[in-house]
């Protein structure tokens, strides 16, 4: 019988998230493997790998906020907004002061706005990914999405090499490549992402992430610990049979709209949602089914 849980992986550069997940599957001979959000090919950092029954809670972990460190090269623009693309525009460098940069950066603190994703992205329009339109040189309407930038901090400004190094905390769905373009526009210039490292996904930190070459079953985080780490409400329920059968249950003095139900051994059994008053109904069950 195989265990269920998550691995906190540190994705290296130049492999896709899909390739990384496949490596996990083959290395540990796991039947069901998923993830909580892709990273660009050139990006590095935290990827949450879901194993077996943990794949059933992907939506809850996927909605988590993220944090990144990003290096932006000024005065050059690529079609993909990163180093993987082709250069489509250059600009004669001009002086941008540290004060100017700090003034622009300060705008992106607790800032919500309509962001346009890059054409080279996996967002689907009419059943087709945006990058497929780009590769086929086809026109497509790109719709904006509301995102929130909670905090942006300037880590370094390399004036000699025209590079800005930032720390960004943002909501799910934020494209850092698009954010880089927007920051450059505010500086009256162009730019692209040369380095991108995801340092946080929910409460999973880069310092806890494992390189694929070092990965083993000992690095598995249980579903129980994963949901606790991310501040979800966990309730131990006395009648396990009712939960396994997907029946409505009564939970008193619970303010949360969503709760994870566990047994006395800290096995997460199901996700329940508030139905009315103190009655909860099952939203996702079968989280403790055996995988062979």
Swiss-Prot record:
Pfam families: TruB_N (PF01509). It catalyses: uridine(55) in tRNA = pseudouridine(55) in tRNA. It is an enzyme of class 5 (isomerase). One of its GO terms (biological process) is mRNA pseudouridine synthesis. The active site is at 40 (nucleophile). InterPro entries: PsdUridine_synth_cat_dom_sf, PsdUridine_synth_N, tRNA_psdUridine_synth_TruB. Keywords: Isomerase, tRNA processing. CDD domains: PseudoU_synth_EcTruB. Its EC number is 5.4.99.25. GO terms for molecular function: RNA binding; tRNA pseudouridine(55) synthase activity. Belongs to the pseudouridine synthase TruB family. Type 1 subfamily. NCBIfam families: TruB (TIGR00431). Responsible for synthesis of pseudouridine from uracil-55 in the psi GC loop of transfer RNAs. This is tRNA pseudouridine synthase B. It comes from Mycoplasma capricolum subsp. capricolum (strain California kid / ATCC 27343 / NCTC 10154). The gene is truB.
